[in-house]
């Protein structure tokens, strides 16, 4: 190719390239290894004269990305194998001479040609300069283009709060540097914006990748539902209380608000919300003016009744008890008679929904109220039953019941209803009220000396006189009542016995007062010698134990009562025998013998049923000798033992049935043993200071001695000591049993 190109031609100016210093010493050898370009390799390029090979050569040149038509010759010249050498960046004369020696064909196209000199040769391990894009900040100085060194610009970054934010910023900056080489990066970050109400508990910080964020602490569906219910309960309660506490609201509005609150209290979750948030005081404070209106008082009593129905009922303080005492005295509706039926119907609907909701949940509800008997007093009495039973160990509550006049009202209520029953009035509702009143007094008098003394001496012993009258009414009327009514009377009688046991415990005054009431002691003995065996089969155990315990309290420290008891003649019936009248001491002794023998029979049956074969050699011999012995369908052999082979073939239902029978017999054995023990304890106390009647007792005992009584009392002592050892109040009971055992042992 011709080399007559003008040196002033602008396209003949050299393109400055950096020399790689690491390859200068090997440049001559590498030039010899470069293959030459033949005409056959580029058919469109004409032959060019040979160019002498220089000892030094520059590395391959990187071409601009865009070339105009004017520099096509330069492109072709740079693609040859004999590329001119660049001695330095500042020397341009040698490059100009090299460019003049090369002939550029103007007819040659501007397309980029391939050369083996620029191909990657893995064997040569050539270090090539990376292809770089043309920078915008190139500087043209005298025909040479310099790329100034790019210095990192210092950018001020404000540190806002904590070190954690600094670490997050470092993470984000490192991640952005890592992905800075990616093409087509968006100008706006892909991280979603957080709402202004976002908190650290629900929204987390962005991930290191920079793509979105991760939400932590996601609540479960049930947690979301509970949270929503909690908010609803809180808003509803605040709204209702605002109406109840408003001074401008009328009594009608407050009454309707209280009924709305009662409808909310039907839900167990709402009642639990009230207790967990300690809203009881706020509710009681909002209902403090309810006694001023009878219908408002009915709605308030409904709220208190529902709040006390749970096992973990609300805590009752002094303001609550004061409200209860005020509502307890409202027994009639004397205000707003035109709205009475409407309010009563609304309250009755609340109770119907409550009963329905409890039955759906599988819980049995005992609700014996009638619509026509709905009053604030009746509802508060029902609520007091639960309040006192849950606070049986709270002495402060028991004292406040007395100070606020609640016990006085309950005693008066008992007197009124006993008189109604004695006058042959409608006694169904009266029996229900007596049942509730007995429960309240029982809980409020247990191990509380002050309340016991008050109940005994209040209004000239009106309580114990009313109880003795009620006992006489039961014995006179039980023959005329239907079976269902008899059950109600016997159940109420058992509760009355519990109350009398509490107030007569270690109280000589009560014992003497009860012994002085005409007919009380013989009637008390008749309850377990005649009434319980004949009419109260379901409550026979309770009547026997409760009434025997009451008589034990009466004769333990009062010899006058012992003499009165010995002188009495009572009716007695033993199962399988006719009714007969015998002396009281003989009746108690014969009942002891009966129950003790029943316990021994059950004990022997249990020994036979629980004696399983162990599969020893002796058993095999017995089986060979008695091989003809067959077992019945229940798996019991003729000798009374359970057949193990038969038991192994029984399915699970049959095994459960067999075990249930064993447990029933064990329960019957325990009941018989306990009743016999209490009869023996009563006989032992009656015989003290009355040794003249020892022969009357011995002639009815097995072996004519007291050994069976002593053994039963020792069992009772061990059982009581094991179950009541931690209670200080039971120490007197231990000592009483010990004294009777020692007394009977001396008699032997």
From Swiss-Prot:
BP-aspect Gene Ontology terms: DNA repair; meiotic cell cycle; mitotic sister chromatid segregation; positive regulation of double-strand break repair via homologous recombination
Null allele phenotype: Mutants have an egg-laying defect and reduced brood size with 20.8% displaying embryonic lethality whilst 28.38% arrest at the larval stage. Recombination intermediates accumulate in mid pachytene nuclei resulting in delayed meiotic double stranded break repair. Irregular polar body extrusion from the egg pronucleus and localization following meiotic divisions which can lead to aneuploidy in the embryo. Altered meiotic chromosomal organization due to shorter axial elements in late pachytene nuclei.
Highest rank taxon of the organism: Eukaryota
Keywords, comma-separated and alphabetical: DNA damage, DNA repair, Meiosis, Nucleus
UniProt-annotated location(s): Nucleus
Leader peptide range in chain numbering: none
Composition bias, Polar residues: 68-79, 87-96
Chain ranges of the WAPL domain: 205-723
Coarse class of the protein's main subcellular location: nucleus
Bias kind Basic and acidic residues: ranges: 634-644
Transport found in the keyword field: no
GO cellular component: germ cell nucleus
Chain segments carrying region Disordered: 23-199, 614-644
GO MF annotations, alphabetized: ATP-dependent protein-DNA unloader activity; cohesin unloader activity
Amino acid composition bias (Acidic residues), ranges on this chain: 616-633
One of the Pfam families matching this protein, by short name: WAPL
SUPFAM superfamilies per record: ARM repeat
Start-end of Low complexity biased regions: 35-64, 172-182
Cross-referenced InterPro entries: ARM-like, ARM-type_fold, WAPL, WAPL_C, WAPL_dom
Protein purpose: Regulator of meiotic chromosome structure and function, playing a role in sister chromatid cohesion, possibly via antagonizing the coh-3/-4 association with axial elements in nuclei during late prophase, cohesin association with chromatin, DNA double strand break repair and polar body positioning following meiotic divisions during oogenesis. Regulates the morphogenesis and temporal assembly of axial elements to control the organization of meiotic chromosomes in pachytene nuclei and is also involved in meiotic chromosomal remodeling in late pachytene nuclei.
Family: Belongs to the WAPL family.
Annotated protein name in UniProt: Wings apart-like protein homolog 1
Organism: Caenorhabditis elegans
Name of the encoding gene: wapl-1
């Amino acid at each position: 190719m011709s080399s007559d190109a003008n040196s002033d031609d602008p396209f003949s100016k050299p393109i400055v390239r950096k020399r790689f210093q690491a390859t200068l010493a090997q440049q001559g050898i590498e030039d010899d290894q470069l293959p030459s370009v033949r005409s056959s390799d580029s058919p469109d390029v004409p032959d060019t004269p040979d160019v002498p090979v220089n000892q030094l050569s520059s590395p391959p040149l990187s071409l601009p990305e865009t070339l105009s038509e004017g520099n096509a010759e330069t492109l072709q010249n740079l693609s040859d194998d004999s590329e001119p050498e660049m001695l330095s960046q500042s020397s341009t004369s040698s490059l100009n001479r090299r460019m003049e020696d090369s002939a550029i064909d103007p007819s040659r196209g501007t397309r980029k040609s391939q050369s083996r000199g620029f191909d990657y040769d893995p064997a040569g391990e050539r270090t090539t300069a990376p292809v770089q894009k043309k920078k915008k900040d190139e500087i043209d100085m005298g025909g040479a283009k310099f790329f100034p060194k790019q210095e990192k610009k210092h950018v001020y970054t404000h540190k806002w709060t904590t070190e954690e934010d600094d670490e997050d910023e470092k993470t984000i900056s490192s991640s952005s540097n890592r992905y800075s080489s990616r093409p087509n990066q968006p100008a706006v970050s892909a991280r979603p914006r957080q709402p202004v109400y976002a908190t650290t508990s629900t929204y987390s910080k962005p991930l290191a990748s920079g793509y979105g964020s991760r939400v932590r602490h996601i609540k479960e569906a049930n947690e979301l539902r509970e949270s929503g219910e909690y908010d609803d309960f809180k808003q509803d309660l605040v709204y209702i209380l605002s109406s109840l506490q408003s001074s401008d609201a009328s009594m009608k509005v407050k009454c309707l608000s209280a009924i709305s609150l009662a409808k909310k209290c039907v839900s167990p979750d709402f009642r639990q919300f009230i207790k967990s948030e300690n809203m009881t005081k706020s509710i009681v404070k909002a209902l403090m003016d309810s006694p001023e209106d009878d219908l408002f008082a009915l709605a308030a009593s409904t709220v208190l009744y529902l709040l006390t129905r749970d096992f973990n009922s609300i805590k009752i303080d002094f303001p609550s008890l004061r409200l209860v005492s005020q509502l307890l005295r409202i027994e009639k509706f004397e205000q707003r008679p035109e709205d009475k039926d409407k309010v009563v119907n609304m309250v009755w609907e609340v109770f119907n929904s409550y009963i329905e909701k409890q039955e759906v949940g599988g819980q049995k509800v005992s609700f014996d109220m009638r619509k026509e008997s709905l009053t604030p007093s009746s509802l508060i009495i029902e609520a007091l039953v639960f309040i006192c039973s849950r606070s049986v160990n709270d002495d402060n509550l028991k004292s406040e019941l007395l100070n606020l006049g609640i016990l006085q009202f309950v005693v008066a209520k008992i007197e009124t209803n006993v008189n109604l029953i004695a006058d042959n009035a409608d006694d169904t509702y009266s029996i229900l009220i007596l049942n509730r009143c007995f429960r309240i007094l029982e809980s409020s008098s247990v191990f509380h000396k002050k309340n016991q003394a008050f109940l005994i001496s209040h209004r000239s012993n009106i309580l114990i006189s009313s109880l003795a009258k009620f006992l006489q009414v039961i014995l006179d009327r039980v023959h005329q009542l239907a079976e269902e009514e008899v059950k109600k009377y016997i159940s109420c009688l058992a509760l009355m016995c519990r109350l009398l046991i509490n107030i007569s415990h270690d109280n000589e005054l009560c014992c003497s007062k009860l012994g002085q009431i005409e007919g009380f002691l013989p009637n008390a003995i008749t309850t377990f010698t005649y009434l319980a065996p004949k009419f109260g089969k379901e409550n026979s155990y309770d009547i026997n134990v409760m009434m025997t315990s009451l008589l034990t309290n009466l004769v333990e420290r009062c010899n006058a009562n012992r003499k009165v008891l010995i002188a009495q003649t009572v009716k007695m019936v033993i199962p399988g025998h006719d009714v007969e009248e015998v002396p009281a001491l003989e009746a108690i002794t014969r009942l002891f013998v009966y129950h003790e023998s029943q316990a021994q029979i059950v004990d022997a049956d249990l020994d036979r049923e629980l004696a399983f074969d162990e599969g020893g050699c002796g058993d095999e011999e017995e089986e060979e000798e008695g091989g003809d012995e067959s077992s019945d369908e229940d798996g019991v052999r003729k000798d009374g033992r359970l057949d193990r082979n038969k038991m192994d073939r029984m399915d699970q239902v049959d095994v459960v049935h067999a075990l249930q029978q064993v447990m029933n017999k064990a329960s019957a054995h325990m009941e018989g043993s306990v009743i016999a023990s209490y009869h023996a304890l009563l006989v032992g106390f009656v015989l003290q200071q009355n040794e003249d009647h020892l022969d009357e007792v011995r002639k009815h005992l097995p072996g004519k001695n007291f050994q069976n009584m002593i053994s039963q009392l020792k069992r009772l002592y061990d059982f009581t000591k094991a179950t009541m050892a931690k209670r200080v109040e039971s120490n007197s009971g231990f000592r009483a049993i010990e004294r009777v055992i020692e007394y009977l042992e001396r008699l032997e």
